[in-house]
Amino acid sequence: MGKGSMTAHATPNEPDYPPPPGGPPPPADIGRLLLRCHDRPGIIAAVSTFLARAGANIISLDQHSTAPEGGTFLQRAIFHLPGLTAAVDELQRDFGSTVADKFGIDYRFAEAAKPKRVAIMASTEDHCLLDLLWRNRRGELEMSVVMVIANHPDLAAHVRPFGVPFIHIPATRDTRTEAEQRQLQLLSGNVDLVVLARYMQILSPGFLEAIGCPLINIHHSFLPAFTGAAPYQRARERGVKLIGATAHYVTEVLDEGPIIEQDVVRVDHTHTVDDLVRVGADVERAVLSRAVLWHCQDRVIVHHNQTIVF
């Protein structure tokens, strides 16, 4: 990962201007700086001095070191800088030459008011897809949904009222290569994030390498105990006491990417299979929407195979 190209994928300890439901976007002159490097004295001072000399006022500053000595330092700074949009490219260059080169920092600047371009991929289950579209229409998510891609046509009528293009690309085990080529034509260079909202196809390593942006997936937290078909039936037969969900970044290793968010709900012997499915869908919606929001707010930094969420 080269300097200036940090793939920050980023938890909410401060307000950071989250838009209220239906409210305005973040102020235009609010910027975010994410960085990661080998820990050593002087990093915070150097970052703060650079921003001050650029005319920026730091609103909040969160940092974490993985160890007292020899650890990795991670930081997220929120700052106000008049005329940020015109200055952000210069900030990126100057920070690289004056601070990042000295400390070996991987970093990225972002404008809070510039929403992430997001594509959602789905199959036939609608709960996660429609929840994201609904929350986004209410102004709860800092993103612009540019398209929905599905390998089945079932959800087209549900997506149209949101004014988002629905693209049906059939994908089976036999047609996966052709389907992924078409998906890449639509996605590569056009989106900042892809959300797999219960997209029930395994993406190839070649697709993940070529896509050029992070992907977030959601799955129930029975994995790996109840993989495959009918997990809720088998979970009830086993007498599970907790139902949960995990949102994570997608890697070549299935369902083992860096975890962004997890949650659980307690269940008991009175819950039927249908009850478990309903509870599971509720927690999946909540977990996925939080993970997507945190990513779009530049709160997540990936460190090895885990995340630091500020």
Curated annotation (Swiss-Prot):
Coiled-coil annotated spans: none
Q: By what name is this protein known?
A: Formyltetrahydrofolate deformylase
Pathway(s)? Purine metabolism; IMP biosynthesis via de novo pathway; formate from 10-formyl-5,6,7,8-tetrahydrofolate: step 1/1
Gene that this sequence comes from: purU
Q: Which family does it belong to?
A: Belongs to the PurU family.
- The keyword Transmembrane is annotated on this UniProt entry: no
What are the UniProt keywords, alphabetically? Hydrolase, One-carbon metabolism, Purine biosynthesis
Query: In which organism is this protein found?
Result: Mycobacterium bovis (strain ATCC BAA-935 / AF2122/97)
Q: Which GO molecular function annotations are given, in alphabetical order?
A: formyltetrahydrofolate deformylase activity
Q: What domain of life?
A: Bacteria
Question: What NCBIfam families does this protein map onto?
Answer: PRK06027.1, PurU
Query: Which PROSITE patterns does this one have?
Result: ACT
Q: Which residues form the active site?
A: 255
